[in-house]
């Protein structure tokens, strides 16, 4: 067994190379406590313990998938995630988050893509921004994009957070979603032109784009992320 979610996977990876982290969780149970890195500090907003397992179906390129009388052969490896996770849908924020951020060097934001109520989403974002006032002035704020159930919610999150983040990170599926077409990821000129369009839509200091071929940083002083990108690729491939 293992734990999922962007922040938890990051904490597990960081622990393997000797870096500590602190997590804001929305679900807690015996398995979460058992599988978290022992040195990882955490808070949890859940009023009671629950278990919401996510079913993840991974498939390889050209794998034959039979769905009733149809056969599907995907052009690239990918995955499908099925879940019914009420804690993620509600995304309660623990008021102790403000205190947790006092000494943060890097703050990763992710997880709003599962929310389904606009008023709740706006409330959570307002509370998040209040907590972020406690961040040190030199803290790096990193936003990891995701596939939103409601595309309008993606825009709401961006509009609220764009002025507060230094790095906006996304994968190729999300990248193509913003550009509105398929992109040849092996054509450097097409990728660059598409990144220029994306940067106009999402004017942040740096964009990190990670694909199944490569990862890159685009924007102000992008070279400063070269070692981090290489480390992420090595970690993801081992």
Can you name each region flagged by the protein language model?
Residues 1-238:
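Ribokinase/PfkB-type carbohydrate-kinase core domain
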């Amino acid at each position: 067994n293992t734990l999922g979610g962007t922040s938890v996977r990051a904490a597990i990876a960081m622990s393997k190379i000797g870096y500590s982290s602190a997590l804001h969780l929305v679900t807690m149970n015996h398995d979460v406590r058992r599988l978290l890195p022992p040195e990882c500090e955490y808070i949890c907003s859940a009023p009671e313990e629950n278990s919401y397992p996510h079913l993840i179906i991974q498939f390889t390129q050209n794998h034959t998938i039979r769905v009733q009388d149809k056969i599907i052969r995907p052009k690239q490896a990918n995955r499908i995630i099925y879940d019914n996770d009420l804690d993620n849908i509600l995304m309660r924020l623990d008021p102790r988050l403000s205190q947790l951020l006092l000494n943060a060097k890097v703050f990763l934001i992710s997880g709003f893509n599962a929310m389904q109520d606009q008023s709740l989403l706006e409330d959570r974002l307002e509370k998040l921004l209040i907590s972020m006032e406690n961040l040190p002035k030199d803290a790096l704020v990193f936003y990891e994009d995701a596939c939103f159930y409601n595309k309008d919610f993606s825009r709401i999150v961006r509009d609220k957070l764009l002025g507060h983040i230094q790095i906006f990170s996304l994968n190729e599926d999300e990248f193509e979603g913003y550009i509105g077409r398929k992109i040849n990821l092996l054509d450097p000129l097409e990728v660059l032109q598409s990144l220029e369009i994306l940067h106009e839509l999402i004017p942040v200091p740096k964009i990190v784009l990670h694909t199944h071929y490569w990862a890159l940083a685009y924007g102000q002083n992008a070279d400063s992320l070269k070692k981090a990108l290489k480390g992420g690729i090595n970690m993801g491939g081992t």
